[in-house]
Amino acid sequence: MSITNPVFSSRLKTLATLGAALFVSAGVAAQTVVDQTAAAQTAEAQAWRTQLTPYVWMTGLQGHIQPVSGAPTVQVDKSFSEVLENLDAAFFVSGTARKDRWVLHGDFSHASTSSAEPLPMGLSARAKVRQSSLTLTGGRNWQLTPQSSVDLLGGVRVWDIHAQVQVPGVASAQSNTSFVDPVVAVRWRYDFDKQWSSLLYADAGGFGVGSDVTWQALASINYQWRENIYLSLGYRHLSVDYRSGGKRLDFSQTGPLLGVTFKY
């Protein structure tokens, strides 16, 4: 014999209805969270992410300078401490912008130095070099592993070089030279953990278009100091060999660097 209690049955139906409603609501809420997370990730991937790095480059200077045909060729070989003694001005900054897998990178270097160099027959020449270079590249990023990625880049390096050689009481010659070199580059990053990472960068160019050859190499260790601030310690080499119409500008800069990166 079964006993049906109308009140009990009504309560069961009410509980079942509420349970179903809660289940559906939870499912909708979960799907909403997933949709919002996916939308946020998509928006982040589509937005430009930028960083700016002013840095100090403790570079030496080595090379040969002949500002015009027939002028004396001066050999320069200065350590950073010697360059610092004769440094007139210097400014270095680099920046990167990323959107999804696309990458834009730029670096600007400017330095002006002057020094006295010996010549044959007991003469002395005063050499002054003001060099500015702007490297602009773009390309694509590939994620190799969860900890490492590589950028393959192509672009140009724009040079503006003022060179002057003066032999007191004998002669003086100067030239202003500007040219553009095509460059190809590779940039590899490896994350050791959430705070420490390493960076390797190399490029090569010129190919006879502007200079005969230009190349650059850089290695750095980076530390995340604040949420959007990174500190870097590295070593950099940059060289160019330009020869045209009796003019020779063949020099390289090498030395350690310290940088601060601000991410936006």
Language-model features and meaning:
Residues 31-110, 259-263:
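Short glycine/proline- and aromatic-enriched beta-strand/turn motifs that initiate or cap beta-hairpins
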Residues 46-48, 87-91, 130-134, 148, ...:
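Residues that define the transmembrane beta-barrel architecture of outer-membrane proteins
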Residues 52, 93-99, 136-140, 154-156, ...:
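Residues on the lipid-exposed face of transmembrane beta-strands in outer-membrane beta-barrel proteins
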Residues 56-60, 80, 99-101, 108-114, ...:
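Transmembrane beta-strands of outer-membrane beta-barrel pores
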Residues 64-81, 112-129, 160-176, 242-248:
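Flexible, solvent-exposed loop segments that connect beta-strands
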Residues 101-104, 147-148, 194-198, 225-231:
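Repeated loop/turn-to-beta-strand initiation elements of outer-membrane beta-barrel proteins
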